[in-house]
């Protein structure tokens, strides 16, 4: 590890808590070197949630974690966005890009895949399923370290019957089985994180994950189902008038 503590050791010695930005790989090293130090993750990646929880359980001197970002926001356009060529041909964050694209919650307040993952990593839920947009399963997207996944809790992909699908399952269980319309399509064990990936084929109907302990006892089940033909979407604006280019219309 680079000895960057030559710049911080004197300052941190006079502080109650040391704030670390994207420094989770230093936690163990620095706590061993400075036994009286208290560490707070003052800015971290969404993908570090599981590792943070494991470190915090191991050492009570790690007292908290602030992720960038909790909710998407205006500005820093595209810094945390995963967009595809059909929507953003240049991946340059230029004209047409509005928000950062980063966050466990989107601009409308909807929890995203990162939030789902975090709840499992923090032991608030036992199991969750998220699906990468099936119409873009194998497509390249804009790069960003501030987004962990664009998978969502949906098994409704109209026009994608028979296409390749990538399913993410989040669990702390010993192993998990994935079923599509009652047929088991695979069994996997989480390794150094609480997520596993299944490459499968999309079929309308039902997808179910079943989590097991080491003795093959069922811990939890989670199911997603395809929306029926009667399902419709309706948009109702909160305001009847907004300013062009400056206001958001909810």
Language-model features: where?
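Catalytic cores of extracellular degradative/oxidative enzymes
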Residues: 1
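Substrate-binding clefts and catalytic carboxylate motifs of secreted carbohydrate-active enzymes
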Residues: 10-247
């Amino acid at each position: 590890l680079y000895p960057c503590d030559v710049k911080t050791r004197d300052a941190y010695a006079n502080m109650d808590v040391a704030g670390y930005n994207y420094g989770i790989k230093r936690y163990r090293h620095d706590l061993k070197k400075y036994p009286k130090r208290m560490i707070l993750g003052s800015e971290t990646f969404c993908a570090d949630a599981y590792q943070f929880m494991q470190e915090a359980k191991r050492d009570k001197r790690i007292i908290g974690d602030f992720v960038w970002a909790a909710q998407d926001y205006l500005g820093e356009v595209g810094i945390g966005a995963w967009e595809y060529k059909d929507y953003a041909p240049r991946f340059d964050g230029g004209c047409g890009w509005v928000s950062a694209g980063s966050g466990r919650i989107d601009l409308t307040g909807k929890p995203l895949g990162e939030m789902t993952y975090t709840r499992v990593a923090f032991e608030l839920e036992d199991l969750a399923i998220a699906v990468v947009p099936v119409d873009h399963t194998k497509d390249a997207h804009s790069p960003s370290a501030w987004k962990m996944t664009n998978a969502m809790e949906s098994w409704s992909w109209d026009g994608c019957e028979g296409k390749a699908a990538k399913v993410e399952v989040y669990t702390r269980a010993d192993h998990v089985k994935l079923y599509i319309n009652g047929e088991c399509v695979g069994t996997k064990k989480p390794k150094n994180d609480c997520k596993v990936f299944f490459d499968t084929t999309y079929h309308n109907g039902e997808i179910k994950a079943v989590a097991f302990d080491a003795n093959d006892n069922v811990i939890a089940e989670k199911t997603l189902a395809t929306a029926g033909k009667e399902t419709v979407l309706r948009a109702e604006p909160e305001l009847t008038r907004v300013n062009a280019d400056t206001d958001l219309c909810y």
